[in-house]
Design a protein with these regions (language model features):
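Acidic/His- and Gly-rich active-site-bordering loop/insert found
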Residues: 2-104
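Zn-dependent metallopeptidase/amidohydrolase metal-coordination segment
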Residues: 9-12, 335-358, 362, 418-476
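His/Asp/Glu-rich mid-to-C-terminal helical/loop segments that flank catalytic regions of hydrolases
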Residues: 37, 157, 223-240, 268-271, ...
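Active-site-adjacent substrate-binding region
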Residues: 218, 223-227, 231-248, 392, ...
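Substrate-recognition/cap regions that form aromatic- and gly/pro-loop-enriched pockets
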Residues: 340-426
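Midchain, well-structured core segments that form catalytic/ion-binding scaffolds
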Residues: 95, 101-106, 145-146, 151-152, ...
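Active-site metal-coordination/substrate-binding segment of hydrolases
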Residues: 65-156, 162-163, 202, 316, ...
């Protein structure tokens, strides 16, 4: 059956509008899962909803295509829910108000949720169409944005009887994603012995307005890590005078390069100008080491209220040594794909709590052995510094498949349909594909998507001219997967 561009556009946007009407914050997907289940049943598909509210939707092969291998189309139902300043928005009750200006689809003051609502909408639309295809399975997962717990919990049996998986959670229409990085949460803790401050002057040292960014996608941009910078500052001050450290903090998520950090300390010195030398030294260092990419940072040290408690010199030295000696940033580049980071680590957040200082480190690699290796290095470093370090369960990596038939079919079909080449690359960030690969290493997996810009922000917008070609690409690829 031949479909016009308008039919495809209207059909997919209608499916997306259904999703936008249902609040679907991560870990609150029951309503959207129930809606999609009933909708898929209404057009004749078989549906399984697991205890996590993941959906497994099966469509029988078209007549004459029963012997073709099964193809999975996959997306996630949850979305990142954020609103612009001043916008009244409750992620648990408020629908997304869609604005279509003919060029972009966006929301009125909130994130749009095209990540990954548009992937789910495209799959739902294709499940209703008549064309040559083998058995199709749509898998819609929960909680991709916060923990990938849906993909992690998915029963492997839904992956073992398929040959191909098309993930629809990428954001660039002309880019085919071949692999993604795994990761592991490394958590360090120093138990603190508190005492009353002996010094009567207190100061707050702040580094802020560094660039920051995603600790996977932006790790090779060379941005400064604010946590590492303040550890240098503490060392510099310790060389000039005796101090008592009261707190150290940087509160961004572990998958964000810290753009700001601060520490509070006491000193026998009552003249803040003494510390201006350290401020100037840190500024000079940032300009020399990061001046090409860090343009707007500020470094300050100002008097503050005397803290009620400070940590021992041993505790402070242990924490600062661990941060200073921790390897962060790009640790290894790929020897196979030019420009691809193979191993990295990000330090932050750092939190001073009631009885401890907690430090988070987040290593990434598509090679699971490297992720485990760097986690073990942090554990050994912690022992040297008197810091308790534990490593969580690693999220697996998804390595590129050099023999991928699906990759060649996608690249060929894209060129035929669009008249120019699609780029194929790996990313140094996480995708649910990693868990699917771990459950079935023989599954041929790729990831694609239309142009979705400024995701996870109120400026998120979907470029409409890439939507129909994206849907046509999925359909065209499936029509060729006869063996």
């Amino acid at each position: 059956m031949s479909l016009t561009d308008k039919e495809i556009m209207d059909g997919v946007l209608a499916e997306f509008s259904n999703l936008a009407a249902i609040p679907r914050k991560s870990n609150h997907e029951e309503a959207v899962s129930n809606f999609l289940k009933e909708r898929a049943l209404s057009f004749g598909c078989k549906v399984v909803q697991d205890e996590k509210f993941n959906l497994i939707i099966d469509k029988d092969a078209a007549k004459g295509c029963e012997a073709w291998p099964r193809v999975i189309i996959q997306g996630h139902m949850d979305m990142v829910c954020v609103a612009a300043e001043g916008v009244q928005y409750d992620p648990l009750t408020s629908p997304i108000k869609i604005i279509n200006d003919g060029e972009f689809l966006r929301a009125d003051g909130t994130s749009l949720g095209a990540d990954d609502g548009i992937g789910v909408a495209a799959a739902m639309y294709l499940l209703q169409q008549d064309f040559n295809h083998g058995p199709i399975r749509a898998i819609f997962t929960v909680d991709e944005e916060q923990g990938m717990t849906g993909a992690k919990a998915l029963d492997a049996k839904y992956l073992l009887d398929a040959k191909y998986l098309i993930n629809c959670d990428s954001e660039a229409f002309d880019v085919l994603t071949l692999s993604s990085a795994g990761s592991v949460n490394v958590d360090a803790e120093r138990r603190i012995t508190w005492h009353k401050p002996e010094h009567r002057s207190a100061y707050k040292f702040v580094v802020k307005d560094l660039h920051g960014g995603h600790s996977g996608e932006a790790i090779n941009c060379g941005y400064a890590n604010a946590v590492k910078i303040i550890a240098q500052a503490i060392n510099s001050i310790m060389k000039k005078t005796e101090i008592e450290l009261a707190s150290i903090s940087s509160l961004k998520a572990r998958n964000v390069i810290p753009s700001e950090a601060e520490f509070v300390f006491t000193s026998p010195l009552s003249n803040v100008k003494v510390f201006d030398v350290v401020v100037a030294k840190i500024i000079d260092y940032l300009k020399a080491a990061y001046g090409n990419v860090e343009k707007n940072f500020t470094v300050t040290c100002v008097p503050c209220e005397l803290p009620e408690r400070v940590m021992s010199e041993e505790d402070a030295s242990s924490i600062v040594d661990f941060i200073n000696l921790s390897m962060t940033g790009v640790l290894k580049m790929s020897q196979v794909e030019e420009g691809l980071v193979e191993l990295s680590a990000n330090i932050g957040p750092v939190v001073t709590k009631e009885n401890a200082v907690e430090i988070s480190v987040f290593p990434r690699s598509a090679v699971d052995a490297l992720t485990r290796e760097i986690a073990n290095i942090y554990i050994q470093l912690g022992k040297r510094c008197g810091i308790r370090v534990v490593s969580g369960e690693p999220a697996p990596g998804w390595p590129a498949n050099p023999d991928s038939q699906l990759k060649h079919v996608v690249l060929e079909t894209f060129k035929e349909q669009n008249g120019f080449d699609m780029k194929a690359k790996s990313i140094h960030a996480g995708l649910e594909c990693s868990y699917f690969y771990a459950k079935n290493p023989n599954l041929d997996i790729i990831s694609i998507g239309p142009n979705n810009i400024d995701i996870h922000s109120p400026n998120e917008r979907l470029e409409l001219k890439t939507l129909v070609p994206h849907v046509k690409l999925i359909k065209g690829v499936i029509e060729k997967l006869d063996k």
